[in-house]
From Swiss-Prot:
It comes from Drosophila melanogaster (Fruit fly). Early fractionation of eukaryotic MCM proteins yielded a variety of dimeric, trimeric and tetrameric complexes with unclear biological significance. Specifically a MCM467 subcomplex is shown to have in vitro helicase activity which is inhibited by the MCM2 subunit. The MCM2-7 hexamer is the proposed physiological active complex. ADP binds at residues 611, 614. This is DNA replication licensing factor Mcm6. The gene is Mcm6. Its main location: nucleus. It catalyses: ATP + H2O = ADP + phosphate + H(+).
Length: 817
């Protein structure tokens, strides 16, 4: 049965092109063979199921069978599509032996030419094309009236197969020759044909977007089996045709209505009304949309072909590559210096910072995502944060990663809101329903989200990505929409220190405006400090000049970017398992990190938690993937621990110069006068023993510089002793406090075994006195208790000795680290 004969009671001109295409396509289905048997017999038999109604046909098979038919389908697709569907229905009915006709549809795959969203113009309306894009918005599924059956209210004639033009369309006129009804019709819902309908919006990917242009978007219409097959954030290839649909949002908008009453007031002139808007009518506007017949999820091009996003094995990937590409991957996997060659090929224009490059490289491979027996997901993606001074190539790292990674989103923290990073709930223009629009983290699903100026984000916006960074999901509960969406993305963030420069005397958390929960979710922290180094500065300047003078020759790569991308994509499919030896080493290394965190040098790091152990596991798995290994070995754990250790203690606390605190205790006027009186005697001694004094001063100056760790050890030792003495005095009922001289004497007794000469004893005594002065006047850890009553001038000299040796107590608010 032909489509042209389906209209009963209405004279229509036969469509010769459509009828011929229908017969040729039915012959193709019945005759095309592959491996000696008819290819589409089994797929047609599966359409017997009530859930199936679409037959997928490879367009390459049509081209092999009849080039003229393929050309007609390409050029006249929308015109002959009903005839092609009718041929599928006839073919299915003949093969299966159905008693009743079943409405079937055809979907073409493997259309050779892919077009960009920006290339969709009116010249492509009605042709079969394939476009690619990223889904940014999905609408709910609702029924669509495709073909209506109407009843004339005047003569009761049934009018069948009234095609709906993407809006409710009444018959133009009653098909009864003796009836001239044009308005009064009623829809017969029971006999009309409804299909599932879903509308989605896609936009250009960042790789296809010309510089300085706004991403173009187009609406995709999905029907029948294609609904609910796409997810916001994923990239797909859509095969179908570009169509023109009425702009229903304009029709449903607020406008002027036709007035039934008189349009003029009594006494006014009877002037005519001009213009359709004055009559209460609206202009019918049209817009372009894409009617899809097949959808395929894809990632970036791999080995010259498109690689599906579903789980694939090494054998599947091998089939997608040529022999030369496979041999190159095998050769790279055997490279003894692969680790270094990959980072030199990935960042050829950035000098130095090899540790940062290694961390970002391991982020490309990622760990292994796991699911526990309680259905709890453990993320495998690695999050990296780069903190550093201006002009240390932070943004350059992010830009190169966003250009290299097949699925990467680059955004700025200050210009991004919480909804822009996660997901937004917006109102549909046509149905006025609330729909979810994907944010940056959803668009970077199974990829990397590069966030620059991470520290400039508002606090509430940082809180919004807590869940996405650890659970890798985004939960939304607003405007009546409750949903949990996937955000399986790695985050590469760049942040600046608070005052523009990294302060070595402060801890990492004190240098950046990030909360502790956010910091603990990063696996690696890299601190870049702009130090003045003549050798490094010369090398960086030479590199920059070479890049500006001769860009191509100055870039040295061991492998091309395509080879690195192909190798990373291939290695990511490995799922390495932790060996027993590697597990023991992971536990030992985590114990070392925790012990060091509780030590005195822990101020320079952030808090070590169980998340750092999981970070070490992910980094170890990434190292195993880099070597295409199915097992995590001890050497992988060793490198992961080294990298994590490097990122945690990248910047140490500076040495403490006790000589800088000289004079802090000289603010007392009496003390100053006494020193002035004794200057003459001191000068005479210096004149007689000039050489000895200078030598002794040099020795003392060396001793008065302590490392931060030694300084913390000594200060903690004194504080604990003084608090023990304070507690003892309080129990005995004596005055609280301990004399300064007693503290010095106690310390010298503790280190008596280490003192071998009188000079060393004097040096130790001067050192501990300087240390006590710093704790009093600089750190304000110790409080000196001095007499506050006024005394006669005569008693000043007598009481000076007592004031020079005051009682010392520990500040009550001081907490020992």
């Amino acid at each position: 049965m032909d489509v042209a004969d389906a209209q009963v009671g209405q004279l229509r001109v036969k469509d010769e092109v459509g009828i011929r295409a229908q017969k040729l396509f039915q012959d193709f289905l019945e005759e095309f063979k592959e491996d000696g048997e008819i290819k589409y017999t089994r797929p047609a038999a599966s359409l017997e199921s009530p859930d199936r109604c679409t037959l997928e046909v490879s367009f390459e098979d049509v081209e092999k069978y009849d080039q003229n038919l393929a050309t007609a389908i390409i050029e006249e697709y929308y015109h002959i599509y009903p005839f092609l569907c009718q041929s599928v229905s006839n073919y299915v009915k003949d093969r299966i032996g159905l008693k009743t006709q079943k409405d079937c549809y055809v979907a073409f795959t493997e259309v050779p030419t892919r077009h960009k969203v920006r290339d969709l113009t009116t010249s492509k309306i009605g042709t079969l094309i394939r476009i690619s894009g990223q889904v940014v918005r999905t609408h709910p599924v609702h029924p669509e009236l495709v073909s209506g059956v109407f009843m004339c209210l005047d003569c009761q004639t049934e009018i069948r197969n009234v095609e709906q033009q993407f809006k409710f369309t009444n018959p133009t006129i009653c098909r009864n020759p003796v009836c001239s009804n044009r308005k009064r019709f009623m829809l017969d819902v029971e006999k009309s044909l409804f299909l599932d309908f879903q509308k989605i919006r896609i936009q250009e990917t960042q790789a296809e977007l010309p510089r300085g242009c706004i991403p173009r978007a187009v609406e995709i219409i999905l029907r029948s089996e294609l609904v609910e097959t796409v997810q916001a954030g994923d990239r797909y290839d859509f095969t179908g045709t570009l169509i023109v649909v009425p702009d229903v949002s304009v029709l449903a908008g607020v406008g002027t209505r036709a007035e039934n009453s008189s349009r003029h007031k009594p006494g006014e002139g009877m002037d005519g009304v001009t213009g359709l808007k004055a009559l209460g009518m609206r202009e019918l506007n049209y817009r372009m949309a894409f009617l899809a017949c097949s959808v395929q999820a894809t990632t970036a091009r791999f080995g010259g072909t498109d690689l599906p996003m579903s789980e694939v094995t090494a054998e599947d990937m091998k089939k997608q590559m040529t022999d030369a590409e496979w041999h190159k991957i095998y050769e790279m996997s055997k490279d003894r210096n692969l680790y270094q060659n990959l980072i030199s090929s990935l960042f050829p224009s950035i000098y130095g910072n090899d540790e940062v490059k290694r961390g970002i490289l391991l982020q490309q491979f990622g760990g292994v995502a796991k699911t526990t027996t309680e259905k709890t997901s453990l993320r495998g993606d690695i999050n990296v944060c780069i903190v550093g001074d201006p002009s240390t190539a932070k943004s350059q790292f992010l830009k190169q990663v966003s250009d290299f990674s097949p699925r990467a989103i680059y955004t700025s923290g200050k210009a991004s809101s919480a909804a822009g990073l996660t997901a937004a709930v917006v109102r549909d223009e046509e149905s006025f329903d609330f729909v979810i629009e994907a944010g940056a983290l959803m668009l970077a699903d199974n990829g990397i989200c590069c966030i620059d100026e991470f520290d400039k984000m508002d606090q509430r916006d940082q809180v919004a990505i807590h869940e996405a960074m650890e659970q890798q999901t985004i939960s939304i509960a607003r405007a009546g929409v409750r949903a949990t969406l996937n955000a399986r993305t790695s985050i590469l963030a760049a942040a600046n220190p608070i005052n523009g420069r990294y302060d070595r005397s402060k801890s990492l958390q004190q240098n950046i405006q990030l909360s502790a929960p956010i910091m603990s979710r990063f696996d690696l922290f890299f601190i870049l400090v702009d130090e003045c180094n003549e050798v490094v500065d010369y090398a960086i300047a030479r590199k920059i000049v070479d890049l500006h003078s001769n860009i191509e020759e100055s870039v040295e790569r061991a492998y091309t970017r395509e080879e690195v991308l192909r190798y990373v994509t291939f290695a990511r499919q490995f799922k390495p398992v932790i060996s027993q030896e590697a597990g023991h080493m992971l536990v030992e290394n985590y114990g070392h990190l925790r012990q060091r965190d509780t030590g005195t040098s822990g101020r320079s790091t952030w808090r070590i938690t169980v998340r750092q152990l999981e970070s070490m596991i992910r980094l170890s798995e990434a190292m195993a993937k880099l070597e295409c290994s199915n097992r995590v070995l001890e050497r992988h754990v060793k490198e992961a621990f080294r990298l994590l250790n490097k990122s945690i203690i990248r910047v140490e606390q500076p040495d403490i110069h006790l000589d800088d605190d000289e004079g802090l205790d000289m603010d007392d006027g009496i003390q100053h006068d006494i020193d002035m009186e004794n200057n003459g005697a001191a000068a005479n001694v210096d004149e007689n023993n000039g050489m000895d004094t200078s030598a002794s001063g040099a020795v003392q100056k060396k001793k008065f510089t302590l490392s931060f760790e030694d300084y913390k050890n000594l200060s903690t030792m004194l504080v604990l002793h003084m608090r023990a003495e304070e507690a003892r005095c309080e129990v005995e009922g004596n005055d609280t406090g301990i004399k300064r001289s007693n503290v010095v004497t106690w310390y010298l007794e503790q280190v008596a075994d280490q003192i071998e000469s009188e000079d060393e004893l004097i040096s130790r005594k001067n050192l501990i006195e300087k240390l006590i002065d710093r704790l009093i006047y600089h750190d304000q850890v110790i409080i000196p208790l001095k007499t506050s009553t006024l005394k006669p001038r005569i008693q000043v000299q007598k009481d000076f000795v007592e004031e020079d040796d005051p009682l010392l107590v520990v500040h009550p608010n001081y907490v020992v680290e």
